[in-house]
Structure formats: C-alpha cells, structure tokens
C-alpha cells in the first residue's frame, strides 16, 4: 500500500486534493489556534490530529497560534500546558510559536482601514443595549443611534479608545454590515472592546483588544494559511470571516471549512462545566485522571498513540454525533495489550500460607509479555507465604468458578499447583489466612499423574511484596449524556474512584510515571505522577481488561 493510500480520507482531504490538483494551492498550510484560557481536552486532540496530521501527510506546514485576545482569562501557564500537550501527542509546529498578539499593530491598522471605508464605527451603547438592539432569530435588529457617525469622528473616538479615554464597556468598535441580516453574527458585530488588563505577551501596551472573529481571519491571512479548519459552531462565522477579508487590503484570502466537534459519552467538554468540577472539588484538578483533559488522560496512562488512533477511527465529518466511551477505551486497551509489560499485583489481598513449602524461597522466571519473547523475562521471588486476591478464593463454589476452592487445586501463575486445605477467620467471620499444600513437582509444568488443573491465579510473595496504593478509576459520570441532566453534578459516578491498599511484585519499585503495565488478570495501570513516593508507589488504573460497562448498557 502506498503512502497516499494509507492516509485517512474525509471531505476536508478531498477538498485539499482538489485544490492541489487544480493549482489553486501548491502547498498546504494549516494551523491550530487555541485560546490559552484553560487546558486542552480530548475534543482539542481531534483538531490537533486533523490540522497537524494534514500538514504532515501533505508535507506542508501547521502553525501553533495562540488566540490571545482576552488578557483577563488567559495565562502563560495555559500556554506552556498547551505546547506540552501538542508535543506529547507527537506533533511539531512550523517555525516559532505564534500569537494573535503578534499582529496587534496590523489588526489596529486594518480596523482604521475599515473606519476610513465607512465600514466600522465607534458605538457607545452599553453591552446590554447592544444585545437588545441585535434582535432575535425571528426579529431583525435595529441600528445604533451612533451608527452614522462620520469617518473623522469615528477615527477620533477610536483613538480615544486606544488612549484609554473610555472606561470598560463605555465604547466599542463595530463593523457596519446589516442589522437586518438573517445571520445574527452579521448584525454589526463588535470588532474591538476595551479591557484594562495586563497582557501576558504585550504587557500594558494596549487597552483595546480585537475580537476573535476579527482577529482569526486576518491572522490566517497574514500567516498564509490555505485551509482554516474550525468546528461546526463557527459555520455562521464564516460569513464574517469572508466579509472582513473582502473589505481590507490583504493579498491572501484563506477559506474556512467546518467539521463536527467531538462529543464523548460519560463526560462533559464544556470549559465552564469542567471548571466547576475543579473549583467545587469534585475532582482534584485539571489533570485528574477522570477528566477528559489531555493532561488527565496522560496521567491516567493513556498513550499519545492511542489518542491519535482514536481520532483516526472516529474520522472527520460534518455530522454531529456522540462517540461511545468504549471506542476510546478500546484504543488504549489494544495499545497496552500489545506493548505493556506484564506484572503481578494483588488489589484486595488475603494471606495464603503453603504449609509444606520448605526453605526461605526461590526465584521463578516470568515472561514480560506472553506473545513477545523479545521483551524478555524477569525473576520474581516466590515463598511459602504469599498474597492472593480475596476474590480468587471461595470456601464453596459451583463448577463455573475456576479459581481456588477449599479442598480443590489451582495453579499459581508461572509457579506451582496448590490445594486449599483450611482457613482461619477473625471474630467477624472474615477469612484472614488460607492454608494450602503444594505439589513440588509442578513448577511451570503439569502434574506428573496427568490430573487437570484448570484455574490460574496471580500472587505476590509476602516477604518481598511492595506495598502500593491502587486507584481504580472509572467513568466520571454514571449516565452517557451528563450534559443533558438538569444538574450534571447530580449524575457524577460515586464509584469513579475507589482507592485500595495492595501489594505488588518488587520489580515495580523501579516503575516510572507514564510507563504502563498490565497487572495480570486485573487491567492496565501506570505509576501516578502526582502522589507516588519511593516508600509508597501509587498506581492508576488506565482501563480494565474488558469493557465492564457493556452489560450495564444492555
């Protein structure tokens, strides 16, 4: 298969192919323009993969440009976080990082050009009055009483705005288009507003700041963007995008194309709702492993490759739809099943004593991956006292139960066959110790007499066990569409985080944050980057071995 045939196909790539074939463009230049007022989430990952992926596949360029036109909400912390997320996902921007604020002088000059052409005016209506005058979807707007000021008066007033002569909210610059337009975005939109706030890039040079719709199209043109890709909520804004570029003196006129945004089950994407989860302490921060943020997914153990694969699978369309969480989980599960080394950890431990085991212990050899001998093997200590999971033992059980039962045998993973003989309980009737015997001639082999032992359970040597905290993360919400609830906070899943104290094999003391493991028979886990210490490692469950929510939805 050729490189071109291996590329994903979608309507945007078809447009690009046609543009290149017709000679409209000789190269492809895209951009990813986040506002630095929060952390990126999985929805942004779709846009990142689309814009950078197209540039990569067509051997073009993709700019990283921060839409930093609102100094009140923006911060350098978000700038650095976004840069880190883009790089972590495996992409590299063309040239230096760009900022819309790089173009503030040019934007100001273009605003003056519109005033000189009679296409922009300074309005002194209050923000509330502007909303009132704008009209509705069924009623046209009405003209501002300040709409017909002369060019000279507008130039003087705009300079007064620039010089700090108006208070915030007392004046703005508006485009002069059509207050009766069926598209509300074209009813004399605001181009500049006043904000007395220090900007993280330009300091206190400016007290007037351009609006997104004015900034976006001009920044695209100044950078030579060929295909400006936005989500569908900006579809009507394309009219304003084109109007601005049609009415200023600029040699390049990019085209905007819209695609559907990513909606994912069992989570919310709204910045306001995500912020509420953080500020009300429903989660511990923007990088909480239950959050849909890229930093949260990374801390949970998601790989960049799995997120890229997810974005590839869901594709790019103009049709709004909601993607099943199982699709995202399937991508990370497939990735880690293929690439994660295996290890043993007991999440809900109960002591097991092998009464006829002689000696202090021994080392058993275990493969790091059952299907990849090239990943090597490791030595795991075994002894006469081990920890097993409480769910792996029953005093009585039916034939479907393939684990340890009183009076019956089971195999310890890569070790011996054992038989449960008796148990010891506390005053409440809880089992505290299981006493067993073992067949010394069954180390990693079948019993000599040919008897069949069907069940296999994992274990950790008690004398060598590494105490660990295990955080069992699950979906943050208990319903597929929490945003549709009257109060989305009321449908938070109370079991989205369950903390257990368990034991792991000693090799895991060398685990590093971001490195994934399959805890055999339990799921995929990674060392937590925030809470782990050398004395007490903390492991986060990335995803289970199978989709446990499938039955819930049936």
UniProtKB/Swiss-Prot annotation:
A cellular-component GO term for this protein: cytosol
UniProt cross-references to SUPFAM superfamilies, sorted A to Z: Nucleotidylyl transferase (SSF52374), Ribosomal protein L25-like (SSF50715)
Placement of sequence motif 'KMSKS' region: 268-272
Residue segments, region Interaction with tRNA: 317-324
BP-aspect Gene Ontology terms: glutaminyl-tRNA aminoacylation; glutamyl-tRNA aminoacylation
Subcellular location: Cytoplasm
Protein name according to UniProt: Glutamine--tRNA ligase
Taxonomic lineage from the root: Bacteria, Pseudomonadati, Pseudomonadota, Gammaproteobacteria, Enterobacterales
